[in-house]
Amino acid sequence: MKVAVLGAAGGIGQALALLLKTQLPAGSKLSLYDIAPVTPGVAVDLSHIPTAVEIKGFAGEDPTPALEGADVVLISAGVARKPGMDRSDLFNINAGIVRNLIEKVAVTCPKALVGIITNPVNTTVAIAAEVLKKAGVYDKNRLFGVTTLDVIRSETFIAELKGLNVADVKVNVIGGHSGVTILPLLSQVEGVTFSDEEVASLTKRIQNAGTEVVEAKAGGGSATLSMGQAACRFGMSLVRGLQGEANIVECAYVDGGSEHAEFFAQPVLLGKNGIEKVLPYGEVSAFEANARDSMLDTLKGDIKLGVDFVK
């Protein structure tokens, strides 16, 4: 099993690489790529951790050596949010970065499962899909927008609010990965009820949690560590699915034939082909149905931005 992290010298990439070095199955290979010259050194640093995961780092303009033979590719390359920016402000820089990296993926490891972490995810996943289509290698079951951070935040905030064991909290988060497009289905959380006020405030907190971190770091960064953990959870789920483990389900932003938009975050069953099955997200409350329907123009606009960028 080979996992490649592109953008591995950044805040998310280093956290993700550390977690993968400690969690990937014995005998796995982990390759780190970043344009930054420090990247081989990050790999040397991590190589001193005593786990049976072989690690190599590559720097420079060309990610090809890191991508050769990769089963899973996780892309966190790009610029991070600063105070006053929203995820869409990142588009101008990150769109080109994702396009260029996916062009290399299309040539070097077209069958790999690809998880896009680089924001704005609503748009960068659409960019990746268009690039892969142009190259004639697009498989909608192998491309994912990583929205796991919205899920782990929801789990955490619900557990805190209700005094639950966080390990027992399961919640689907649907839609997209920015602002109003993030929709936690709180009505489905088992064993707990929320007042209308709690639903409204909790939903808003989950939607704005990225900004909460950006502001708390006061210009010193964005949500890198929690995102690293979220990306590791999702990456490990992809690996476990590839290895044939049963019942691996995660929410992700995918081209899953949704009635709502071309790309939509919902639960998917993972396996040897990536997505084995797109799962229904279940019954929703009136509040959730309204929030879902009113986000769609925003989401579709984000997707169109990505499609138009490549065309």
Swiss-Prot record:
InterPro entries: L-lactate/malate_DH (IPR001557), Lactate/malate_DH_C (IPR022383), Lactate/malate_DH_N (IPR001236), Lactate_DH/Glyco_Ohase_4_C (IPR015955), Malate_DH_AS (IPR001252), Malate_DH_type1 (IPR010097), Malate_DH_type1_bac (IPR023958), NAD(P)-bd_dom_sf (IPR036291). GO terms for molecular function: L-malate dehydrogenase (NAD+) activity. It comes from the Bacteria. One of its GO terms (cellular component) is cytoplasm. NCBIfam families: MDH_euk_gproteo (TIGR01772). It comes from Shewanella sp. (strain ANA-3). SUPFAM superfamilies: LDH C-terminal domain-like (SSF56327), NAD(P)-binding Rossmann-fold domains (SSF51735). It is an enzyme of class 1 (oxidoreductase). Its EC number is 1.1.1.37. Transmembrane segments: none annotated. The active site is at residue 177. This is Malate dehydrogenase. Keywords: NAD, Oxidoreductase, Tricarboxylic acid cycle. NAD(+) binds at residues 7-13, 34, 94, 117-119, 227. Substrate binds at residues 81, 87, 119, 153. The gene is mdh. Belongs to the LDH/MDH superfamily. MDH type 1 family. Homodimer. Pfam families: Ldh_1_C, Ldh_1_N. GO terms for biological process: malate metabolic process; tricarboxylic acid cycle. Catalyzes the reversible oxidation of malate to oxaloacetate. It catalyses: (S)-malate + NAD(+) = oxaloacetate + NADH + H(+).
